[in-house]
Design a protein with these regions (language model features):
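Core, highly hydrophobic multi-pass alpha-helical transmembrane subunits of bioenergetic inner membranes
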Residues: 1-274
Length: 274
């Protein structure tokens, strides 16, 4: 999944960046990748399938990498590729474990209260989710914030600017919604739950990835860039990422508290099972 979707596609374009940058196709790529980022963020907010939400968040980050690549900043795309690999791998491992413990069920409306039953997995899940949002000093912050500041410095039009920032807000939106459904709301699947935290073989790998999700951003930013980027922005532009993230957080919290269920009536068939 990751090899085909993210690594092969982005890495090939990074390698062929000098050829691509000369063509007219690059502006078209910027538009398409910006719209991909935006649409993936919107779609993830309407999904109730855990794996689909994480897959759409991967697609959103793919759009982010493609768009910064199409602006000519291939080293930033590579940096984000590496940091994103750390926390997204952790996120997929946590999701796989949760789905397995939920009796192979993927619907987030049936999950809830995970932080009480599987605390270590919940810890890994939440930290990787926050790294995805670009919370300061986690892995995602160093690459994502730098990309957004470089975009703010560039001389592109407002459409690209809005696409970037709205997509960042949407990332926070669906992440908080997911965390509310999984960690805060009530457990809804069975009368007796079979959640347990004893899979230490998997937890070892998860803790290594957790450690990398915490330190890989600053570590790689020292290793990859030979000199720091000169970014000169007014205070409000600098704080723009924080503003959209806070709006996304507020919206995610409000929406997940409302009893909004999709028009899909397939969920009613679960009543026949028990």
């Amino acid at each position: 999944h990751s090899s085909t979707l993210v690594t092969a596609g982005i890495y090939l374009l990074i390698r062929f960046n000098n050829l691509l940058i000369e063509t007219m196709f690059i502006k078209f790529l910027l538009l398409i990748s910006g719209l991909t980022m935006f649409m993936a963020g919107i779609s993830a907010n309407y999904e109730f399938d855990l794996k689909k939400i994480i897959a759409l968040s991967t697609l959103s980050q793919l759009g982010l990498m493609m768009s910064i690549l199409s602006m000519g900043y291939y080293e930033l795309a590579y940096f984000h590729l590496l940091t994103h690999a750390m926390f997204k791998a952790l996120l997929f491992m946590c999701a796989g474990k949760v789905i397995h413990l939920m009796n192979d069920n993927q619907d987030i409306r049936l999950m809830g209260g995970m932080s009480l039953y599987i605390p270590l997995t919940s810890l890994c899940f939440n930290i990787s989710n926050l790294a995805l949002c670009g919370i300061p000093f986690l892995a995602g912050f160093y690459s994502k914030d730098l990309i957004l500041e470089v975009v703010s410095m560039s001389n592109l039009n407002f459409m690209v600017f809005y696409l970037y920032y709205i997509s960042t807000g949407l990332t926070m939106f669906y992440t908080i919604r997911l965390m509310m459904y999984l960690m805060v709301n009530d457990y809804n699947l069975l009368v007796i739950y079979n959640l347990f935290e004893e899979d230490y073989i998997m937890l070892n790998s998860m803790f290594i990835l957790l450690f990398m999700s915490l330190i890989s951003g600053s570590f790689l930013s020292w290793m990859i860039f030979s000199y720091p980027y000169m970014i000169y922005l007014p205070f409000n532009m600098k704080m723009m990422v924080i503003y959209v993230s806070l709006i996304g957080l507020l919206m995610g919290g409000l929406i997940s508290n409302m009893k909004i269920y999709s028009l899909n009536k397939f969920m009613l068939t679960y009543n026949l099972s028990f």
